[in-house]
């Protein structure tokens, strides 16, 4: 895959929106945040028919930490009329947030009229009744939007666990939020849901006479098992409710569920798919729509990992020759979650014995009766590094591995390993490519992950302040 400089191309909307190209990351090399933001605004952010979005920001004082004055952003996503065509999947964490508990109930409601997202506080395990707080805000928003009731509002929260949301401050700022609604661009919403994210994430495709637009946030506490972080996918095509729900479950499985930043599954993970019911849909085109939906979700997954907290490299692990999908994904997750391998990649260190260790750790724990030792072949950057039960290494190969990892770097660390500003835009869509053929079956999958750097520790040691 070659990467093009955005400035070298004409700004033709038809050229850039033909397809999402998410399976290879963004096809462009961005030289600045301004160039990336211009690309999103000009070529990705147009809303499907029948949607509007808004954001508003305000200051508040957390009751659990009055010494830490904070800022909250509320983001509103609204179909032109309440719609019965909506789907959602949520975290499987045993301590789900109050918004997740409310959201699961919303799936049984006949219609959805709005999605409300707040940053800074996740409303998880908060004393005093997190569900009641979420419902109170939903009821008040419903009044401002003239909906039938709060049951038509889906709440989502992201941020600090254990704090209670500032209901009074949120309710006070709802009128301004509603006033800010606009139907041109999803970019304000993509920016509004960010927390430790360094840049907004938008993917879109025109398909079947309509449009799909997706946004997502998430940079840490990421290893989903049902959904991931917060992601909102909008379409104007009138696809039946039961079909949307089946499609979302299927697509999430090998996109969002096949990535990991730090192995920690959030208590608030939510993915929604909502139709504004504006454009008739021919069910004969369902496969085409599913392919486009998969592209959008995979693209957002790649964007999330590329903006993982402290990330200097993104690893793409392709596992083949497995006996089952579970085995393939398990091997891939074991590799991208290995702290030793993640550190080696961060340092452009070709210590690939750690890669073999990570595969063996998983297989020895979960599939000890399957002998892969002399059947497995591993490549990094297209170079064979393990075959016939032995490492294949020499000075020339190690030099190629170092060059491959350096070429995939997102940022050049400053002296001491820390970079104060980090990367606030994705400079390219390259990966540290790892291919693992287990040689015992026909199942295959792809898993994404990042390296482990000083910045990750610094960010998470100082998150609340």
Curated annotation (Swiss-Prot):
Pathway: Amino-acid biosynthesis; L-arginine biosynthesis; L-ornithine and N-acetyl-L-glutamate from L-glutamate and N(2)-acetyl-L-ornithine (cyclic): step 1/1; Amino-acid biosynthesis; L-arginine biosynthesis; N(2)-acetyl-L-ornithine from L-glutamate: step 1/4. The record marks 227-228 as: Cleavage. The active site is at residue 228. One of its GO terms (molecular function) is glutamate N-acetyltransferase activity. Its main location: mitochondrion. Keywords: Acyltransferase, Amino-acid biosynthesis, Arginine biosynthesis, Autocatalytic cleavage, Mitochondrion, Multifunctional enzyme, Transferase. The alpha and beta chains are autoproteolytically processed from a single precursor protein within the mitochondrion. Disulfide bonds: none annotated. The record marks 158-159 as: Involved in the stabilization of negative charge on the oxyanion by the formation of the oxyanion hole. One of its GO terms (biological process) is L-arginine biosynthetic process. GO terms for cellular component: mitochondrial matrix. Its EC number is 2.3.1.35, 2.3.1.1. Substrate binds at residues 195, 217, 228, 309, 460, 465. It is found in: Mitochondrion matrix. It is an enzyme of class 2 (transferase). It holds the Pfam family ArgJ. It comes from the Eukaryota. It catalyses: N(2)-acetyl-L-ornithine + L-glutamate = N-acetyl-L-glutamate + L-ornithine; L-glutamate + acetyl-CoA = N-acetyl-L-glutamate + CoA + H(+). PANTHER family: ARGININE BIOSYNTHESIS BIFUNCTIONAL PROTEIN ARGJ, ARGININE BIOSYNTHESIS BIFUNCTIONAL PROTEIN ARGJ, MITOCHONDRIAL. Heterodimer of an alpha and a beta chain. This protein may be expected to contain an N-terminal transit peptide but none has been predicted. Belongs to the ArgJ family. Catalyzes two activities which are involved in the cyclic version of arginine biosynthesis: the synthesis of acetylglutamate from glutamate and acetyl-CoA, and of ornithine by transacetylation between acetylornithine and glutamate. This is Arginine biosynthesis bifunctional protein ArgJ, mitochondrial. It comes from Phytophthora infestans (strain T30-4) (Potato late blight agent).
């Amino acid at each position: 895959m070659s990467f093009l400089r955005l400035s070298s191309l004409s700004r033709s909307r038809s050229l850039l929106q033909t397809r999402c190209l998410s399976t290879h990351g963004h096809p462009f090399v961005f030289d600045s945040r301004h160039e990336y933001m211009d690309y999103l605004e000009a070529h990705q952010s147009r809303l499907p028919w029948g949607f509007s979005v808004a954001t508003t920001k305000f200051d508040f004082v957390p009751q659990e930490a009055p010494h830490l004055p904070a800022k909250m952003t509320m983001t509103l996503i609204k179909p032109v009329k309440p719609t019965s065509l909506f789907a959602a999947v949520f975290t499987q964490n045993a301590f789900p947030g109050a918004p997740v508990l409310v959201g699961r109930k919303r799936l049984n409601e006949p219609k959805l009229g709005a999605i409300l997202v707040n940053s800074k506080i996740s409303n998880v395990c908060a004393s005093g009744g997190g569900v009641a707080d979420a419902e109170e805000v939903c009821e008040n928003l419903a009044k401002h939007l003239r909906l039938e009731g709060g049951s038509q509002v889906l709440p989502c929260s992201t941020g600090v666990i254990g704090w209670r949301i500032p209901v009074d401050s949120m309710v006070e700022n709802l009128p301004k939020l509603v006033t800010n609604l606009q139907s041109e661009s999803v970019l304000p919403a993509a920016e509004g849901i960010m927390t430790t994210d360094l840049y907004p994430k938008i993917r879109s495709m025109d398909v079947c006479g309509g449009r799909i637009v997706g946004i997502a946030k998430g940079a840490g506490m990421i290893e989903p098992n049902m959904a991931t972080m917060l992601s909102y996918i909008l379409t104007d095509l009138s696809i039946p409710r039961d079909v949307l729900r089946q499609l979302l479950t299927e697509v999430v499985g090998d996109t969002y569920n096949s990535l990991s930043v730090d192995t920690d599954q959030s208590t608030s993970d939510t993915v929604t798919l909502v139709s504004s019911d504006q454009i008739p849909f021919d069910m004969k085109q369902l496969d085409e729509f599913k392919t486009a939906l998969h592209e959008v979700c995979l693209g957002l997954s790649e964007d999330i990992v590329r903006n993982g907290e402290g990330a200097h490299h993104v690893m793409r692990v392709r596992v083949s020759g497995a006996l089952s999908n579970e085995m393939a994904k398990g091997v891939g997750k074991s590799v991208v979650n290995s702290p030793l391998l993640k550190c080696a990649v961060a340092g452009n260190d070709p210590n690939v014995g750690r890669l073999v260790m990570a595969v063996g750790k998983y297989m020895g724990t979960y599939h000890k009766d399957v002998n892969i030792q002399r059947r497995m072949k591993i490549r990094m950057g297209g170079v064979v590094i393990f075959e016939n039960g032995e490492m294949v290494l020499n000075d020339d190969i190690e030099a190629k591995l170092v060059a491959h990892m350096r070429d995939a770097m997102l940022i050049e660390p400053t002296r001491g390993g820390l970079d104060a500003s980090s990367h606030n835009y994705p400079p390219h869509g390259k990966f540290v490519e790892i291919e693992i053929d287990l040689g015992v079956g026909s199942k295959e999958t792809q898993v994404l992950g990042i390296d482990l750097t000083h910045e990750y520790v610094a960010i998470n040691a100082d998150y609340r302040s």
